[in-house]
């Protein structure tokens, strides 16, 4: 599982070092895809393949679901960590997420999110009240 917030830098070649504590959990291979709220989502490859297959099976008759699966599949980029624990973030993904040199990598329980640092700060500030107030339905699953 993935927890925590880290602030690695994107280098000039578009490489990003993932936190050491996430590397073992990612195992052999990972998938980088467009995420929600202009972030990137990083999944262990095996987990992503299970989720993608499930999503594809459910989407055959629903136009919105088909569009989601198409976008997900089209944005999927298979990666392997290099010897220094880095991934190469494609230009398409950097543009989508607005990534600059300053990035934020967060654990989101069963996957990782990569954000532009400024975008993450804006998102966090905008949603702080939502978190503080809590949602009874969401809290009930945690407490």
From Swiss-Prot:
UniProt domain SpoVT-AbrB: residue ranges: 5-47, 76-119
GO MF, one annotated term: DNA-binding transcription factor activity
Keywords from the named record: Cytoplasm, DNA-binding, Repeat, Transcription, Transcription regulation
Pfam families associated with the record: MraZ
Biological process, per Gene Ontology: negative regulation of DNA-templated transcription initiation
Cellular component GO terms held in the UniProt record: cytoplasm; nucleoid
UniProt KW Transcription regulation keyword: yes
Keyword Phosphoprotein in annotation: no
Compartments, as annotated in UniProt: Cytoplasm, Nucleoid
SUPFAM superfamilies from the UniProt entry: AbrB/MazE/MraZ-like
UniProt family annotation: Belongs to the MraZ family.
UniProt subunit comment: Forms oligomers.
NCBIfam families per record: division/cell wall cluster transcriptional repressor MraZ
PANTHER family linked: TRANSCRIPTIONAL REGULATOR MRAZ (PTHR34701:SF1)
HAMAP family found in the cross-reference section: MraZ (MF_01008)
Name of this chain's protein: Transcriptional regulator MraZ
Organism: Corynebacterium jeikeium (strain K411)
Highest classification ranks of the organism: Bacteria, Bacillati, Actinomycetota, Actinomycetes, Mycobacteriales
């Amino acid at each position: 599982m993935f927890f925590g917030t880290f602030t690695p830098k994107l280098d000039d070649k578009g490489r990003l070092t993932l936190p050491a504590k996430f590397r073992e959990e990612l195992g052999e291979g990972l998938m980088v895809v467009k995420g929600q709220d202009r972030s990137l989502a990083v999944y262990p490859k095996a987990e992503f393949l299970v989720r993608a297959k499930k999503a594809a099976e459910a989407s055959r008759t629903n136009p919105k679901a088909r569009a989601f699966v198409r976008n997900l599949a089209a944005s999927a980029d298979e990666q392997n960590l290099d010897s220094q624990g880095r991934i190469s973030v494609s230009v398409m993904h950097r543009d989508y997420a607005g990534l600059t040199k300053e990035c934020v990598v967060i654990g989101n329980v069963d996957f990782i999110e990569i954000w532009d640092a400024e975008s993450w700060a804006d998102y966090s500030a905008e949603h702080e009240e939502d978190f503080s107030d809590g949602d009874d339905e969401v809290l009930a699953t945690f407490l």
